[in-house]
């Protein structure tokens, strides 16, 4: 009997080793390709992942849609994509990008770290997929081709770029009376630079590679009021990775958040000061109220996850309990 147990143990160990001996293919969305920052960070991550029993083979994608589709059909064992694109795999974490939900770095870091803790692990798995890391690309700012567009009212009638796969953005544009123009990561910069659109939301990291200064010209500006944080998701097919990999990965990614935000701050400081435009406090409040109303409507419409909206409100109100929304209970 003892001999049989030993044989079974050795056999099961060999099977486990064989199962994870193959490399896990991770598809990395980076609009620049293999020479981009996202792919460089993924290479650093791949070295760390060896400590958790994974051997990652990285594949660069310049088209995020294809990366997500390849994850669905099993060509990728994991994919690093934006939270907007990742919402189809996990609505809870995919709602992190909700408009106005996380508008400053400190609140965002706290939210991401809480979501990466073991206490939140049950929300990270949906079907065969697991969120193995929550990162950020940075705040989304409005790039406008005319700095006279400094209030919500003045955005009425303007052509505003919206990502066609995000149901929320067209509704927001409609709310301010703008004209939604469908864009994707590959052509948003070109459409702004060629004056096909007047306004485009984008992170600071897009300023140089997409040459957005061309669209800004002499009259344009970047509104220094973040609409949201653009999250990055590492989504894996759970059964293709060693047991416990997801939590180890989330913990490590969360430990790098301060470093990540430091890099983002450097990108922002590298943008010439002449392009930044501050808006008055009363107009900031108008933005916050408009975005809050939009979040509530979009949650009722089933686009945002209500549990995530409630969680993010708690995080915001812990940071700033005097905020007007903290006395309200409809979100």
Where are the predicted features?
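Contiguous mixed-secondary-structure segments that line small-molecule binding/active-site clefts
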Residues: 72, 82-176, 212, 226-330
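Bacterial N-terminal signal peptides that target proteins for export
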Residues: 1-7
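Bilobed "Venus flytrap"/periplasmic-binding protein-like clamshell domains
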Residues: 22-52, 130-194
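Extracytoplasmic small-molecule ligand-binding "clamshell" domains
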Residues: 26-107
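Sec/Tat signal peptide C-region and signal peptidase I cleavage site
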Residues: 17-21
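Bacterial N-terminal signal peptides
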Residues: 7-16
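A ligand-binding cleft/hinge motif common to bilobed small-molecule-binding domains
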Residues: 83-93, 189-194, 199-225
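Alpha-to-beta junction loops
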Residues: 71-81, 159, 179, 194-202
């Amino acid at each position: 009997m003892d001999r049989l147990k030993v044989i079974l143990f050795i056999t099961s160990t060999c099977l486990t080793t064989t199962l994870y001996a193959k490399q896990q293919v991770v598809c990395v969305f980076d609009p620049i390709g293999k020479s981009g920052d996202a792919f460089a960070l993924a290479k650093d991550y791949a070295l760390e992942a060896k400590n958790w029993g994974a051997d990652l083979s990285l594949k660069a994608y310049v088209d995020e849609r294809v990366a997500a589709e390849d994850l669905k059909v099993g060509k990728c064992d994991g994919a690093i994509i934006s939270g907007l694109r990742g919402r189809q795999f996990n609505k809870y974490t995919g709602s992190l990008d909700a408009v106005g939900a996380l508008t400053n770095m400190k609140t965002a870091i706290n939210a991401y770290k809480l979501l990466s803790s073991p206490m939140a692990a049950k929300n990270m798995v949906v079907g065969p997929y697991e969120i193995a890391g929550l990162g950020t690309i940075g705040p989304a700012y409005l790039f406008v081709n005319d700095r006279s567009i400094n209030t919500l009212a003045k955005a009425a009638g303007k052509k505003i770029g919206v990502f066609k796969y995000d149901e929320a953005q067209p509704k927001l544009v409609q709310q301010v009376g703008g004209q939604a123009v469908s864009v994707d990561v590959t052509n948003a910069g070109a459409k702004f630079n060629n004056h096909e659109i007047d306004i485009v939301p984008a992170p600071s990291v897009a300023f140089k590679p997409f040459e957005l200064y061309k669209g800004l010209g002499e009259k344009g500006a970047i509104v220094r009021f973040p609409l949201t944080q653009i999250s990055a998701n590492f989504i894996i097919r759970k059964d293709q990775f060693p047991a416990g990999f997801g939590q180890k990965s989330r913990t490590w990614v969360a430990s790098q958040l301060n470093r990540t935000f430091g890099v983002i701050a450097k990108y922002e400081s590298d943008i010439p000061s002449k392009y930044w435009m501050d808006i008055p406090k009363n107009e900031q409040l108008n933005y916050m109220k408009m975005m809050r109303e939009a979040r509530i409507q979009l949650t009722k419409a089933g686009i945002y996850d209500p549990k995530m909206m409630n969680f993010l409100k708690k995080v915001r109100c812990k940071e700033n309990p005097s905020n007007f929304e903290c006395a309200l209970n409809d979100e």
